[in-house]
């Protein structure tokens, strides 16, 4: 029992080898600056406890030794709480006019697709409805190509 009491425990190993962990440690070949004399704190031996995992140990890297670790409150940080912005509902059962014109284009032979392409090119639309209008403009181009190829399909040049 005397031999075990004489051996140092894992948590009380030489405190000179435990380094301060911070975000900036400085350059290895440049000595750390000493704090001004009015801010010098007396060096107390750092005692460690085996059950506590997070301790603020100050080694050769310097730094501020807080009593309970790192500070919890960040100074000069204001929290601004605002009400959430409420957007209006989209027309046509929440789909928006763009997707409504896209669906109606299948029923009315592509004319609503040209209307949707005209709207997206000329006016400023809601960002939520823009996908439907872009789908209308793509469908109008595909419809135009299909009609042109369909019209030339009956002519035999060969």
Curated annotation (Swiss-Prot):
List S-S links within the chain.
none
Q: Which UniProt keywords apply?
A: Ribonucleoprotein, Ribosomal protein
Reading the lineage from the top rank, the first entry is Eukaryota
| Keyword presence, Disulfide bond | no
What GO cellular component entries does it have? Answer: ribonucleoprotein complex; ribosome
Matching InterPro entries, A to Z?
Answer: Ribosomal_eL20z-like
Q: What family is this protein classified in? A: Belongs to the eukaryotic ribosomal protein eL20 family.
Question: What is this protein's record name?
Answer: Large ribosomal subunit protein eL20z
Report the source organism: Arabidopsis thaliana
The organism that produces this protein has a lineage beginning with: Eukaryota, Viridiplantae, Streptophyta, Embryophyta, Tracheophyta
């Amino acid at each position: 029992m005397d031999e075990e009491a004489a051996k140092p425990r894992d948590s009380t190993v030489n405190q000179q080898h435990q380094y301060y962990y911070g975000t900036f440690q400085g350059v290895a070949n440049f000595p750390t600056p000493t704090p001004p004399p009015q801010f010098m704190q007396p060096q107390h031996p750092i005692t460690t406890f085996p059950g506590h995992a997070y301790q603020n140990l100050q080694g050769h890297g310097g730094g501020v030794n807080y009593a309970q670790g790192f500070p919890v409150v960040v100074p000069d940080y204001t929290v601004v709480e605002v009400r959430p912005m409420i957007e209006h509902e989209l027309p046509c059962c929440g789909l928006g006019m763009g997707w409504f014109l896209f669906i109606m284009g299948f029923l009315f032979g592509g004319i609503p697709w040209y209307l949707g392409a005209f709207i997206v090119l000329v006016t400023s639309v809601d960002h939520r409805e823009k996908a439907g209008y872009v789908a209308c403009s793509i469908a109008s181009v595909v419809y135009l190509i299909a009609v042109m190829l369909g019209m030339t399909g009956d002519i035999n040049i060969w």
